[in-house]
């Protein structure tokens, strides 16, 4: 092992310069022989230890695969723990239900940008996934009869939208993600997975288009670790911290999507950013949609339950994009609350105190701490807040990462999987339904393990790394560590976040987006002016935050470019200058007699953004939406309609 380490250091020290992405600093290899490099070999390496990563790890460990989990924080601190409201599955505990109704709601919620084969896989496997969680020991809330308790969530209906609001969301009070994370972590330890905790993934290791592992920095002692593997799973979460006001934790910096970008993989549908209707005003902390599922409602300055005007049937339980836009319109038209009339009230105090204590204990505490509100007596001040990324690393329904070409269609990237929020299986399309996120995590984390078990055997040979693997990553690390510009990381990050908040918000307009694109491109060049004040390698948060900013910048620039280019309104992407959804047909009218628009003339297609790793230039392409289900005899595709709730 030591001989291999010394050999790598010698090879790295022999090189002089490297050409790197514009999102990185100008680097030189002259100083990097000082870094200790340690090699590891595993059947599978998983980057990230949230719900998706842990579910994949557990399945692989049970099957006897030597599995490593590389995570930049302790697993139970992963952002899955912040998920409050629940996980969707058509169990039928509270009322008759059918997974096909769940499938319909998911397709409708996506505003018909989701791939229906993947949505078929998600909803058909939902009941089994939740039952497995129960068997693993997840302590779901119960009905008096002992069944898993289910609440209403936005966009969920019975009988294909004809039977009223469904109760489909299984929960553990309002701490569902916390409970899931602890359950999965405990079970993955039982399966003998090896955890590399507080390791920061620097880059995927690629060999002629195949992923053969990952290179990471140990935050505790500054050593570099190269993990070679037969399969690599990216499960790093979203990039909410590209925005100023968001519900996501500070570690949600788009590391996985940035890893994919630097590996030459185009990202899918990044323009679709979900704004949750109820983030605490001025703070951003999440107030679960479950609070409205339990009977809470939104009011404006006139005390009006205004959602009745925007969604006469679903009211406060319309899909999140609809509710967030309604709130924003109320504020823009002068009906906001507070001294500045710039937010909305969420009212819960009409509900029995016992119900709040039993079903919503966490948000009662959160509202008290962060808003100074007693929910049994006062409304909670809320505002739409960045919450979720619908886009990410494109995959098929098996969670295999794909590249799309017009000539060959979808092609699998050998050796690479993705799951969780960093992935775009395209089950959410243009707008995710509440409580489909935890479901996405466990279903596609599970899919990773199922498909890897079909592809591999534990005793197969692990491929060798190519010559000089990871050199560029170490050189960039060294350049960031010794960066001596005049712009502090925190200052540049704040400017980026405010730019994204202002120019790519709930409502968008061409001139504002174009201005935002220019600003973001200029800001990305400012990365070369970063100043790192701490030169150490041991628990150096200044260094880590600079690396995270590089990742955030890649995500933010691709997001705003994709948003500026999509000239329609669909789901979470709402354009004032292009207020209509542009499909291949006008679905507000009978399609008989209509001529189908060619692919380049409509917008019911996935955006693909590919950022050049050397120039920073972003190339746009488009991928067709998959309308065909996995088995039309089991459930046929849901044709587009004009959404209403």
From Swiss-Prot:
Catalyzed reactions: a rhodoquinone + succinate = a rhodoquinol + fumarate
Location within or outside the cell: Mitochondrion inner membrane
UniProt pH dependence: Optimum pH is 7.5.
Binding site for FAD: 49, 52, 71-72, 78, 80, 84-86, 201, 255, 421, 432, 437-438
Active site, per annotation: 320
Coiled-coil positions: none
Alphabetized Pfam families for the sequence: FAD_binding_2 (PF00890), Succ_DH_flav_C (PF02910)
Record flagged with keyword Transit peptide: yes
Membrane topology summary: Peripheral membrane protein
GO MF entry, a single one: flavin adenine dinucleotide binding
Any one biological process term the GO annotation gives: tricarboxylic acid cycle
UniProt note on regulation of activity: Inhibited by the fungicide flutolanil.
Tissues in which the UniProt entry reports expression: Expressed in adult muscles (at protein level).
Residues bearing PTM Tele-8alpha-FAD histidine: 79
SUPFAM superfamilies: FAD/NAD(P)-binding domain, Succinate dehydrogenase/fumarate reductase flavoprotein C-terminal domain, Succinate dehydrogenase/fumarate reductase flavoprotein, catalytic domain
Cofactor mode of binding and number, as noted: Binds 1 FAD covalently per subunit.
Keywords associated with the record: Electron transport, FAD, Flavoprotein, Membrane, Mitochondrion, Mitochondrion inner membrane, Nucleotide-binding, Oxidoreductase, Transit peptide, Transport
Listed InterPro entries: FAD-dep_OxRdtase_2_FAD-bd (IPR003953), FAD/NAD-bd_sf (IPR036188), FRD_SDH_FAD_BS (IPR003952), Fum_R/Succ_DH_flav-like_C_sf (IPR037099), Fum_Rdtase/Succ_DH_flav-like_C (IPR015939), SdhA/FrdA/AprA (IPR030664), Succ_DH/fumarate_Rdtase_cat_sf (IPR027477), Succ_DH_flav_su_fwd (IPR011281)
Subunit structure: Component of the mitochondrial electron transport chain complex II composed of four subunits: a flavoprotein (Fp), an iron-sulfur protein (Ip), and a large cytochrome b (CybL) subunit and a small cytochrome b (CybS) subunit. There are 2 developmental stage-specific forms of complex II which have the Ip and CybL subunits in common. Complex II from the free-living larvae (aerobic environment) acts as a succinate dehydrogenase and is composed of the common subunit Ip and CybL and the stage specific subunits FpL and CybSL.
Task performed by this protein: Flavoprotein (Fp) subunit of the mitochondrial electron transport chain complex II which, together with the iron-sulfur protein (Ip) subunit forms the catalytic core of the complex. During the parasitic larvae and adult stages, which occur in an anaerobic environment, acts as a fumarate reductase by transferring electrons from rhodoquinol to fumarate.
Family indicated by similarity: Belongs to the FAD-dependent oxidoreductase 2 family. FRD/SDH subfamily.
Identification of the protein by name: Succinate dehydrogenase [rhodoquinone] flavoprotein subunit 1, mitochondrial
Protein species of origin: Ascaris suum (Pig roundworm)
Taxonomic lineage of the native organism: Eukaryota, Metazoa, Ecdysozoa, Nematoda, Chromadorea
């Amino acid at each position: 092992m030591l001989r291999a380490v010394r050999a790598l250091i010698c090879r790295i020290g022999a090189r002089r310069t490297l050409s790197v992405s514009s999102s990185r600093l100008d680097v030189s290899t002259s100083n990097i022989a000082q870094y200790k490099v340690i090699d590891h070999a595993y059947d599978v390496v998983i980057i990230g230890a949230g719900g998706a990563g842990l579910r994949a790890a557990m399945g692989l460990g049970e099957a006897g695969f030597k599995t490593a989990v590389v995570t930049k924080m302790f697993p139970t601190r992963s952002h899955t723990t912040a998920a409050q409201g629940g996980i969707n599955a058509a169990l039928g505990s509270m009322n008759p239900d059918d997974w096909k109704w769940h499938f319909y709601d998911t397709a409708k919620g996506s505003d018909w940008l989701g791939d229906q084969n993947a949505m078929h896989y998600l909803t058909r496997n939902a009941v089994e996934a939740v039952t497995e969680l129960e068997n693993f020991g997840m302590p779901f809330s119960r009905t008096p009869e002992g069944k898993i308790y289910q609440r209403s969530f936005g966009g969920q209906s019975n009988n294909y939208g004809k039977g009223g609001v469904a109760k489909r969301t299984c929960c553990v009070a309002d701490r569902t993600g916390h409970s899931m994370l602890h359950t999965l972590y405990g079970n993955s330890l039982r399966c003998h997975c090896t955890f590399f905790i507080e390791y920061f993934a620097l880059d995927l290791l690629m060999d002629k288009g195949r992923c053969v592992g990952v290179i990471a920095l140990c935050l505790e002692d500054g050593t570099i670790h190269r993990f070679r593997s037969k399969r690599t799973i990216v499960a790093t979460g979203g990039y909410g911290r590209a925005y100023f006001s968001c519900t996501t934790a500070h570690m949600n910096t788009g590391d996985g999507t940035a890893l994919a970008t630097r590996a030459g993989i185009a990202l899918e549908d990044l323009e679709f950013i979900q704004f949750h209707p109820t983030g605490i005003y001025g703070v951003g902390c999440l107030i679960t949609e479950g609070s409205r599922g339990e009977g809470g409602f939104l009011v404006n300055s006139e005390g009006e339950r205004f959602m009745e005007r925007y969604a006469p049937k679903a009211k406060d339980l319309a899909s999140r994009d609809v509710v967030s836009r309604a709130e924003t319109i109320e504020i823009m038209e002068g009906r906001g609350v507070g001294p500045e009339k710039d937010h909305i009230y969420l009212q819960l105090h009409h509900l029995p105190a016992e119900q709040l204590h039993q079903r919503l204990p966490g948000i009662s505490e959160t509202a008290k701490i962060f808003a100074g509100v007693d929910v049994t007596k006062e409304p909670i001040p809320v505002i739409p807040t960045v919450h979720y990324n619908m886009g990410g690393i494109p995959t098929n329904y098996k969670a295999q990462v794909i590249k799309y070409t017009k000539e060959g269609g979808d092609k699998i990237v050998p050796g690479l999987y993705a799951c969780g929020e960093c992935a775009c299986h395209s089950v959410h399309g243009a707008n995710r339904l509440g409580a489909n996120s935890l479901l996405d995590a466990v279903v596609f984390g599970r899919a990773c393990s199922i498909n890897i078990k079909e592809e591999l055997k534990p005793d197969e040979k692990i491929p060798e790394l190519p010559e000089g693997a990871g050199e560029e990553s170490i050189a960039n690390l060294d350049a960031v560590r010794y960066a001596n510009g005049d712009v502090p990381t925190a200052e540049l990050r704040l400017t980026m976040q405010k730019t994204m908040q202002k120019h790519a918000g709930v409502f968008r307009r061409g001139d504002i987006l174009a201005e935002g694109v220019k600003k973001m491109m200029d800001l990305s060049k400012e990365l070369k002016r970063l100043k790192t004040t701490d030169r150490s390698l041991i628990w150096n948060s200044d260094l880590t935050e600079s690396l995270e900013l590089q990742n955030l910048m890649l995500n933010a620039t691709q997001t705003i470019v994709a948003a500026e280019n999509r000239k329609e309104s669909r789901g979470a992407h709402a354009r004032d200058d292009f207020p209509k959804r542009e499909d291949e047909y006008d679905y507000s009218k009978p399609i008989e007699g209509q001529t189908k628009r060619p692919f380049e003339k409509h917008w019911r297609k996935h955006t693909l953004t590919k950022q050049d790793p050397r120039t920073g230039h972003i190339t746009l392409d488009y991928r067709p939406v998959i309308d065909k289900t996995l088995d039309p005899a089991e459930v046929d595709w849901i044709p587009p309609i004009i959404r209403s709730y």
